[in-house]
Design a protein with these regions (language model features):
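N-terminal Rossmann-like dinucleotide-binding module
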Residues: 1-45
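Hydrophobic residues in well-ordered beta-strands that form the structural core
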Residues: 3, 92, 117-119, 259
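Beta-loop-alpha module in the N-terminal Rossmann-like domain of NAD(P)-dependent dehydrogenases
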Residues: 44-109
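C-terminal helix-rich "cap/oligomerization" subdomain common to oxidoreductases
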Residues: 66-68, 296-337
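Rossmann-fold dehydrogenase core element
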Residues: 105-123, 143-145
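Predominantly a Rossmann-like dinucleotide-binding segment in NAD(P)-dependent oxidoreductases
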Residues: 124-206, 210-214, 330
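Contiguous beta-strand/loop segments that form the cofactor/metal-binding neighborhood of enzyme cores
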Residues: 182, 188-264, 291-303
Length: 337
């Protein structure tokens, strides 16, 4: 596989967890900033011959089986359209795009080239989220009524992200917004998953800039309310939490399930007076790890999972785009009839 870009901070975690694996091999890294590549090369002892300044030159000469994307969100469209030209599948860090227009363009390119375009969310690999889905769809808590999702941390500057990462996270063009896009996407993805791909009727969003001295150009606080014929979602995305969090509350007509970290759930079933906490079942391979999953999809024809699929993430981008317009206008945006 090849790497496109190194400006996304998650690239560091990728190298930390992948370099010792035998089932994947890095065939090339495309990054226009040679100093940035050298920093990673020194830290992870990467072969300098992996370096390419230009992605198309890498694709043409190396012909990787897949491309992992660690660019800004804005650059996802360029990467996907380029990879589609060479019929190479892509997995990118969430979210899919900064605009619904870009998301649709990527979908057209992917479908024309018959390539997979997958979106990697940390929460896709949480057994707790899978367990919440299974419990809901088993009928144990009744028909879905309300979902509340909390995502974020103290703020990218406060937690000390890399300077190249902070640079585009706080750029409204390159990130699509601030916390609204970067953390709102998690809840939009999970709600679309829980709803089996149903689009919401409306999106209403409120954003704030609580720390304008740190984030003068983008929001650092966002709440999105989505409505469905018989359900509602409240997505709370923030760079103002006192700690890092990615958790979800799912309320059915007769019971509830709350995710506790990435591996436990707190469940209250009908006629119970209090919730009980239990361990979520482990996720079965190949859907338990992003690289195992990517390899299975590319080489073995495994089905794209709903959380990372292009179809789900088109809806996620439609939601985020509508939420941004709602926050800007102060109006509720209608998505579906």
């Amino acid at each position: 596989m090849a790497i496109a870009g190194l400006v996304h901070g998650h690239a560091d975690g990728f190298f930390s967890h992948s370099l010792g694996r035998r089932d994947v091999r890095i065939a090339g890294i495309a990054e226009p900033d040679r100093a940035l590549f050298d920093r990673y090369a020194n830290k992870f002892k990467l072969d300098p011959s992996l370096y390419h300044a230009d992605l198309e030159e890498l694709l043409r000469t190396v012909r990787p089986q897949a491309v992992l994307v660690y660019t800004s969100t804005y650059d996802h469209r360029r990467v996907v359209e380029l990879c589609a030209r060479y019929s190479i599948p892509v997995m990118m860090e969430k979210p899919l795009a900064t605009t619904y227009e870009d998301a649709q363009a990527m979908a057209r390119a992917a479908r024309a080239a018959k390539i997979q375009v997958l979106v990697n969310y940390e929460t896709s690999w949480y057994p707790s989220n899978r367990a919440a889905y299974e419990l809901l769809h088993s009928g144990a808590i009744g028909e879905l009524r309300k979902v509340v999702v909390h995502d974020g941390h103290e703020g990218p500057q406060e937690i000390g992200v890399q300077p190249e990462f902070l640079g585009w996270l706080t750029d409204p063009k390159l990130n699509g917004g601030g916390a609204l896009f970067y953390f709102g996407c998690y809840g939009a993805d999970l709600m679309t998953y829980l709803m089996d791909g149903q689009r919401p009727l409306t999106a209403t969003a409120v954003t704030q800039r609580i720390k304008p001295d740190l984030y003068p150009r983008v929001d650092d606080e966002a709440t999105i309310v989505l409505t469905y014929p018989k359900a509602q979602a409240i997505l709370q995305a923030s760079w103002n939490w006192p700690f890092s969090r990615k958790d979800m509350e799912v309320y059915g007509r007769t019971g509830s399930v709350v995710t506790v970290g990435n591996s436990d759930i707190s469940v209250r079933l009908p006629h119970e007076t209090q919730a009980t906490t239990r361990a979520a079942a482990a996720i079965q391979k190949p859907y338990n790890d992003p690289l195992t999953y990517l390899r299975a999809v590319v080489l073995e024809g495994a089905k794209a999972d709903a959380l990372s699929s292009l179809e789900t993430n088109l809806i996620v981008t439609e939601i985020l785009d509508a939420a941004r317009r709602s926050a800007d206008s102060g109006q509720t945006i209608r998505l579906a009839d």
